[in-house]
Regions:
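N-terminal Rossmann-like NAD(P)+-binding subdomain of aldehyde/semialdehyde dehydrogenases
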Residues: 1-124
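Conserved small-residue-rich beta-alpha loop and adjacent elements
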Residues: 108-174
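C-terminal core of ALDH-fold dehydrogenases
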Residues: 322-430
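Conserved small/polar residues in nucleotide/adenosyl-binding loops
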Residues: 433-440
């Protein structure tokens, strides 16, 4: 990995390079994505069956698009018992963590006759997108379905691209069943997002779409936002490690590579105050890469978006971490919890040398669907909050409104909204409205 002395110019150049990976930069694909969406919107099932044949090589129709109970049973027979046990253990941790995020309706009343509150309601229908492609991610199935279940979503459907044989990966099906999905449809890509957003004869329209995907999926989610809600427009995966001289270089190198193997556009960055550590990590990375199964992908990722940055001070290092706002941030310093108090921008923060990033990907419990491309400055991880909506509750009695109604009228008249003012006045000023009979006090 390249080692760079951290300067303002270096930081600016790296940020510019990283931001090129954002889905917002893929304008050349938008026309094709919009064409797919409009075709699905107009031709519904016929369009998604055609695209599935064209892109996935699978013959899908109205009779077989929905995964059956027999197919799920077959998937259980194919999945290793040890993997099933691990999925169930992870599910317990993920559910336990997200249970703590539950929100409840509340009401506050006063003797004067004022009742104010907030009504929390779960979304009715949610669509979860699960990618196929270069790798299979049953962990993403759990991370997207569990918070929706905890929130109380009534119907959760999942879409995922089939193989050429028309089948869905067994681990994906088992994870979905264990998490509590209601239906699984064999359709992927931008066409799946369009089907969930607008509905077809086979695929129901939903209120929100969540889940990761490729460039086409990301741009499709961006295009249908407003017709439905979405979680986020995720970019390629990212890891940043903030370390001092106390860090174990082998641990750091291994953790950087854990994200670099996702795809060629993933980023892996070490920020350190120790030149010695920087050089040791670079050597360890070189040794590890040669041994790993996805070494070609890893090497391309490191060549394009891998950096080791050497800072003059920890303050300078932390400033860089906050500016880049990585999806995953590991803190491997002498006092990592003290360091954590200075971190403002990161999707997930892994504290201490044994809190490796894959722990969060699979098992610990916090959600691994995280903001990318610097959006951790203003976005949060996927949570129960993403699957609820809130309504304000306002109730005033006559006795509560009468003492302050003229204040409201004054506000309305200031904004020249006379109908607003009349809406309040009509309840108390009989002389202004002689044709009305005002309600009497109870």
């Amino acid at each position: 990995m390249r080692i760079i002395e951290l300067t303002e110019e270096a930081r600016t150049n790296i940020l510019e390079n990283l931001l090129k990976r954002s889905p917002n930069s893929y304008g050349e694909f938008e026309g094709r994505v919009n064409e797919i969406i409009e075709n699905v919107r107009a031709n519904r099932d016929a369009a998604i069956f055609d695209y599935t044949k064209r892109f996935d090589g699978a013959d899908i129709n109205a009779e077989n698009i929905l995964v059956t109970e027999d197919e799920i049973k077959e998937a259980y027979e194919k999945v290793d018992e040890k993997l099933l046990t691990v999925i169930r253990k992870a599910l317990v941790n993920i559910r336990k963590y997200h249970e703590k995020q539950r929100q409840y309706s509340w009401f506050d009343s006063e003797e004067s006759g004022i009742i104010l509150g907030q009504k929390v309601t779960a979304l009715e229908k949610v669509g979860v997108y699960v990618p196929g492609g270069k790798a299979v991610y049953p962990s993403s199935v759990l991370m997207n379905i569990v918070p929706a279940k905890v929130a109380g979503v009534k119907t959760i459907v999942m879409t995922t691209p089939p193989g050429k044989d028309g089948k869905v990966n067994p681990a994906t099906l088992v994870a979905a069943k264990e998490a509590g999905v209601d239906a699984i449809y064999k359709v992927g890509g931008a066409q799946a997002i369009a089907a969930l957003a607008f509905g077809t004869e086979s695929v129901p329209k939903v209120d929100k779409i969540v889940g990761p995907g490729n460039i086409y999926v990301a741009l499709a989610k961006k295009a249908v936002f407003g017709f439905v809600s979405i979680d986020s427009i995720a970019g390629p995966s990212e890891i940043m490690v903030l370390a001092d001289e106390t860090a174990n270089p082998r641990f750091v190198a291994a953790d950087l590579l854990s994200q670099a193997e996702h795809d060629e556009m993933a980023s892996a960055i070490l920020v350190t105050t120790s030149r010695d550590l920087a050089e040791q990590v670079s050597k360890e990375v070189e040794g590890f890469v040669a041994q790993l199964s996805r070494k070609e992908i890893i090497q391309k990722s490191l060549d394009n978006y891998g950096y080791i940055l050497v800072a003059e001070s920890m303050d300078e290092a932390i400033a860089t971490v906050n500016e880049i706002a990585s999806e995953h941030l590991e803190l491997v310093t002498k006092n990592p919890f003290e360091t954590m108090t200075k971190i403002r921008n990161a999707g997930a923060i892994f504290v201490g040398e044994y809190s490796s990033e894959p722990l969060g990907d699979y098992f610990a419990g916090p959600n691994h669907v995280l903001p990318t491309n610097g959006t951790a400055k203003f976005f949060s991880p996927l949570s129960v909050d993403d699957f609820i909506k809130k309504s304000s509750i306002i109730s005033y009695s006559r006795e509560a409104l009468e003492p302050i109604y003229k204040d409201i009228v004054q506000f309305a008249e200031c904004e020249q909204l006379t109908a607003h003012a009349n809406s309040i006045r009509v309840r108390f000023e009989a002389d202004s409205y002689p044709h009305l009979t005002l309600p009497t006090k109870a």
